[in-house]
């Protein structure tokens, strides 16, 4: 008889309000919390996004989730977990909503419905003597919000884009289930080889004109897909360029996507 695999998820910490679930998860990891520990909150006071941006956190209308991973992988492969998480969130939302709506991925890790951002993901890594001590994957999903400030006009919620109110607990459970499956596939090769085709099928930038914003300037090209390492392949007049997520921001030539 086949033995049932143990779940990745070992313990949950839930807070009504916290500064940020990523910060809580970091504190727990430093205190010795196990691989597979996860943190949820009803509201955040200091939510964080990629490249130091803040994340709008309204109480009990969104999902604020962070989990602790302690994988035996090379540090340079850790950033790919951001894309693994994006794929998992897209699958989870689709599983809960049904086939009517496709949550696309704007490279590397924003989830968009109707070209509006409804989810952001932030992965942070702590090294000890050159090896991974822990990785925190933070996921913020706008679920049932009914309005947003004008200054974040590219943001929206699942409710605003689909008219569906979702049970946040059900969606959290689905995100964790999907991530566990995608994470196992990632660990087989320690890259995105087994997930690349699936990711590219949801990549809203694929075959579209994009603007790559770098510290030294910007340039345009056509996004073709991703490499097994999660780099965005951009076709330009000078040939194909490979863009790493930590260095740049990518926009559609005529707007957010």
Features from the language model and the residues they span:
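Long, positively charged amphipathic alpha-helical accessory segments at protein N-termini or as interdomain linkers
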Residues: 75-102, 113-257
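N-terminal lobe of the biotin/lipoate ligase/transferase fold
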Residues: 1-98, 102, 119, 166, ...
């Amino acid at each position: 008889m086949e033995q049932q695999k143990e779940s990745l998820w070992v313990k949950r910490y839930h807070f009504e309000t916290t500064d940020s679930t990523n910060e809580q998860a970091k504190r727990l990891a430093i205190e010795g919390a196990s691989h597979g520990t996860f943190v949820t909150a009803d509201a955040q006071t200091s939510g964080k996004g990629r490249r130091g941006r803040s994340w709008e956190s309204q109480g009990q209308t969104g999902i604020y989730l962070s989990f602790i991973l302690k994988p035996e992988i090379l540090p340079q492969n850790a950033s790919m977990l951001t894309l693994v998480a994006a794929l998992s969130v897209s699958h989870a939302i689709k599983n809960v909503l049904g086939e009517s709506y496709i949550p696309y991925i704007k490279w590397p890790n924003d989830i968009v419905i109707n070209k509006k951002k409804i989810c952001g993901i932030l992965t942070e890594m702590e090294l000890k003597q050159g090896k991974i001590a822990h990785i925190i994957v933070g996921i913020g999903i706008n679920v049932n919000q009914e309005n947003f400030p004008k200054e974040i006009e590219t943001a929206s919620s699942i409710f605003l884009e689909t008219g569906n109110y979702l049970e946040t607990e059900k969606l959290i459970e689905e995100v964790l289930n999907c991530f566990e499956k995608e994470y196992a596939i990632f660990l087989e090769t320690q890259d995105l080889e087994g997930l690349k085709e699936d990711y590219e099928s949801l990549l809203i930038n694929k075959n579209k004109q994009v603007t790559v914003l770098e510290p030294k300037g910007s340039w345009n090209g056509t996004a073709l897909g991703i490499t097994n390492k999660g780099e965005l392949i951009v076709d330009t007049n000078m040939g194909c360029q490979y863009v790493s997520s930590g260095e740049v921001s990518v926009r559609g030539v005529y707007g957010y996507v």
